Regions:
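Catalytic phosphate/metal-binding cores of nucleic-acid and nucleotide-processing enzymes, i.e., regions
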Residues: 1-108
Length: 108
């Protein structure tokens, strides 16, 4: 699998990453938010496309970040009928902003 960082940005103090994954002839996008380990988050209560499918202290590939005080939550756009035409870099970025908004508003 090949992974390419397509976009990184900071939204309200949270680093966000949009990544394209290539597996053979298929490709799909994922989005990740870097979160402080001190911030309690119930990932099951975050409303995003397909739900949170990644929650790990390791930065997702291809990111090379080694920060013991951070962890990462994310979602993927590899569900039935998902396409890269629909799940553009911009749409994934908007979904990441919504996740951050939920974290900040306490909807977690």
């Amino acid at each position: 699998m090949t992974s390419i960082l397509e976009r990184s940005f900071n939204f309200n103090g949270f680093n966000c990453y949009g990544i394209m994954r290539h597996m053979g002839d298929n490709c799909y996008r994922c989005g990740y938010v870097q979160v402080s380990k001190r911030l309690p988050i119930n990932t099951a209560s975050i409303n995003c496309h397909g739900g949170i499918t990644y929650a790990n202290k390791e930065a997702p590939s291809p990111l090379e970040i080694d920060d013991k005080n951070k962890w990462y939550i994310g979602f993927d756009c590899a569900h039935a009928f998902d396409t890269t035409d629909f799940w553009t870099v911009s749409r994934v970025s908007n979904e990441l902003r919504q996740i951050v908004g939920q974290i900040l508003s306490g909807e977690r």
